């Protein structure tokens, strides 16, 4: 009888320990899910900010291109004015290129496209039969499995977000380099045009 009582007590202790471990494991998966969801939200906000920054850079580069177009018109007008004033032989008539290489192709050489979503290893585990080895086989383990499945899916999406961010940052860095070249080119041409106009007015 004493041995039976001891065995029952041992089984009861084991059951309590199993319940405790199940509760702790469940809370752990809940925390994991919360953390990856927060990371996902942060990733989405970052992608949105990068997209908005990309739009701003597009507007800035379009402004540089418009200044370049306007400067071509201004340079033509100065040439016509120089001919009219008989200043064709004046050295200041010869406008420099102003960094013509800056006005090449605006393309970054990267095709903007969304990468195809693939099933990663964690998702494959969920598809093939779950993430955990069942002990209590109750609702807690069902929730653990569901939580881990969601965690695996979100981690896969975070990986794709990171790739998208890296590609967008590379694209924007190249665009910033182009904008800097165009800004330098425009400044040089504006300075030259101002000097030329000043000499013309001084000769007039």
Curated annotation (Swiss-Prot):
Swiss-Prot/TrEMBL GO biological process terms: synaptic vesicle fusion to presynaptic active zone membrane; synaptic vesicle priming
Alphabetical UniProt keywords: Cell membrane, Coiled coil, Membrane, Repeat, Synapse, Synaptosome
Pfam families in the record: SNAP-25 (PF00835)
Ranges that cross the membrane: none
Biased composition (Basic and acidic residues): 1-11
One Gene Ontology term, aspect cellular component: presynapse
Keyword flag Nucleotidyltransferase: no
Location relative to the cell: Synapse, Synaptosome; Cell membrane
Gene Ontology MF terms in the entry: SNAP receptor activity; syntaxin-1 binding; voltage-gated potassium channel activity
Keyword Repeat: yes
Stretches for region Disordered: 1-25
Domain t-SNARE coiled-coil homology: 19-81, 138-200
Primary role: May play an important role in the synaptic function of specific neuronal systems. Associates with proteins involved in vesicle docking and membrane fusion.
Family the entry assigns: Belongs to the SNAP-25 family.
Alphabetical list of PANTHER family matching this protein: SYNAPTOSOMAL ASSOCIATED PROTEIN, SYNAPTOSOMAL-ASSOCIATED PROTEIN 25
The name this protein goes by in its record: Synaptosomal-associated protein 25-A
């Amino acid at each position: 009888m004493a041995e039976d009582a001891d065995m029952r007590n041992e089984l009861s202790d084991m059951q309590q320990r199993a319940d405790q471990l199940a509760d702790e494991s469940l809370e752990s998966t809940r925390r994991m899910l919360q953390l990856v969801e927060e990371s996902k939200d942060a990733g989405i906000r970052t992608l949105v900010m990068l997209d908005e920054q990309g739009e701003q850079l597009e507007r800035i580069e379009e402004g540089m291109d418009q200044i370049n177009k306007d400067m071509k018109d201004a340079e033509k007008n100065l040439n016509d004015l120089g001919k009219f004033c008989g200043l064709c032989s004046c050295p200041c008539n010869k406008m420099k290129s102003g960094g013509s290489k800056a006005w090449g192709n605006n393309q970054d050489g990267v095709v903007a496209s969304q990468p195809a979503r693939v099933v990663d290893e964690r998702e494959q585990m969920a598809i093939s039969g779950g993430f955990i080895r069942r002990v209590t086989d109750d609702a807690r383990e069902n929730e653990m499995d569901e939580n881990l499945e969601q965690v695996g899916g979100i981690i896969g999406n975070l990986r794709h977000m990171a790739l998208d961010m890296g590609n967008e940052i590379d694209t924007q860095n190249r665009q910033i380099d182009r904008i800097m070249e165009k800004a330098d080119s425009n400044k040089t041409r504006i300075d030259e045009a101002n000097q030329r106009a000043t000499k013309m007015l001084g000769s007039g």
